[in-house]
Structures are given as structure tokens and as C-alpha cells.
């Protein structure tokens, strides 16, 4: 019985990453790539697409 090894590309640097429980940062190849990705989300360089163009001020207006 042969076990096939699954690999994916790191979303940050595109290096091959083995997809199993020994790859603690999967889908990233390293903690560095994981933190780079987190920083991109925090800086809003990455976002989930949406059809609604609602500003934050409309959703969170103060009421008294």
C-alpha cells in the first residue's frame, strides 16, 4: 500500500509544503510567511470580496 504525499504551495512564497500533521504552519511553510500573511490582512491589503459598499460609519452610528 502506497501513501501519496500531498503538497501545496505556500500562499506567501510559493514554496512546496507537505500537507500533514508535521507541518505546523500549513498552509504556510514557516512562521515568517504566516506572519507576513497576517500583516497583509491587518493592513487591509487582502480582503474578502463583497457586493455591498457600506462604510463603517453607516453600520456603527451612535444613537442616544
Swiss-Prot record:
Stored SUPFAM superfamilies: Glucocorticoid receptor-like (DNA-binding domain)
Keywords, sorted A to Z: Metal-binding, Zinc
UniProt xrefs under InterPro entries: DNA_gyrase_inhibitor_YacG, Znf_NHR/GATA
Metal-binding recorded as keyword: yes
GO MF term (any one): DNA topoisomerase type II (double strand cut, ATP-hydrolyzing) inhibitor activity
NCBIfam families: PRK00418.1 (NF001638)
Family under the similarity heading: Belongs to the DNA gyrase inhibitor YacG family.
Protein name from the UniProt record: DNA gyrase inhibitor YacG
Primary gene name: yacG
Amino acid at each position: 500500500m502506497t501513501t501519496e504525499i500531498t503538497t501545496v504551495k505556500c500562499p506567501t512564497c510559493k514554496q512546496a509544503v507537505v500537507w500533514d500533521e508535521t507541518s505546523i504552519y500549513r498552509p504556510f511553510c514557516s512562521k515568517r510567511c504566516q506572519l507576513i500573511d497576517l500583516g497583509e490582512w491587518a493592513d487591509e491589503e487582502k480582503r474578502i470580496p463583497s457586493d455591498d459598499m457600506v462604510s463603517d460609519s453607516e453600520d456603527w452610528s451612535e444613537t442616544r
